[in-house]
């Protein structure tokens, strides 16, 4: 005889059928056949990416169906959570929430992501860390009148952006004495005039600019 379990709940793997052999001498014999229902499971793979390629040792939590799992990426930026249930006790797919924890302050905290699983398969989610950045806006003015005097002009002055004493970029003022920098990763920088506009002496003042990462939660 072949004994098979039928109408197996969705959350379980269907167990293999079992064969039972009875002989003429087995009168009034009860044969016990044991079936073990195993939950359907799947896996979650997290790919960690960041603008500065520092992806190892990042911490994540995966929560769902009243349970929380903690995992950490390897040096390759990959973390895998294996063999977790696909369905809950009501045979409904479990919605798992993946969150990155203890994100270094230099990054914007990425949004949590949700996922449902497929039995005997790996579902992949990618988390990207964006570095916090800032821009600086500089306006050159006449020290007495703010506007240019006589034959002087506020346009054409060249300024340098420095970090740790090294020149990063140069910018030139427009007709209003203005320029705006591109985005820079948050940190401490300085602005200094390299060559003045026509009619003016060089301003040798070193102006600090920058942004402290702990004061911001967004990219810009």
What are these regions (language model features)?
Residues 1-220:
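Solvent-exposed loop/turn and edge beta-strand elements of beta-rich ligand-binding domains
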């Amino acid at each position: 005889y072949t004994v098979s379990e039928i109408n197996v709940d969705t959350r379980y793997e269907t167990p293999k059928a079992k064969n039972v052999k009875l002989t003429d001498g087995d009168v009034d014999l009860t044969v016990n056949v044991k079936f073990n229902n195993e939950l359907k499971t799947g896996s979650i793979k997290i790919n960690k990416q960041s603008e500065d390629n520092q992806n190892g040792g990042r911490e994540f939590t995966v929560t769902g169906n009243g349970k929380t799992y903690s995992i950490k990426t390897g040096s390759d930026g990959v973390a895998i959570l294996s063999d977790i249930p696909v369905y809950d006790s009501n045979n409904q797919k479990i919605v798992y929430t993946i969150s990155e924890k203890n994100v270094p302050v230099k990054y914007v905290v990425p949004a949590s992501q949700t996922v449902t699983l497929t039995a005997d398969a790996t579902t992949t989610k990618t988390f990207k860390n964006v570095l916090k950045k800032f821009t600086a806006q500089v306006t050159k003015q006449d020290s007495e009148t703010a506007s240019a005097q006589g034959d002087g002009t506020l346009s054409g002055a060249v300024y340098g952006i420095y970090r740790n004493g090294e020149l990063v970029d140069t910018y030139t003022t427009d007709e209003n004495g203005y320029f705006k920098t591109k985005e820079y990763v948050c940190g401490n920088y300085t602005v200094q005039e390299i060559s003045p506009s026509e009619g003016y002496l060089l301003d040798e003042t070193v102006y600090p600019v920058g942004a402290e990462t702990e004061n911001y939660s967004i990219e810009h």
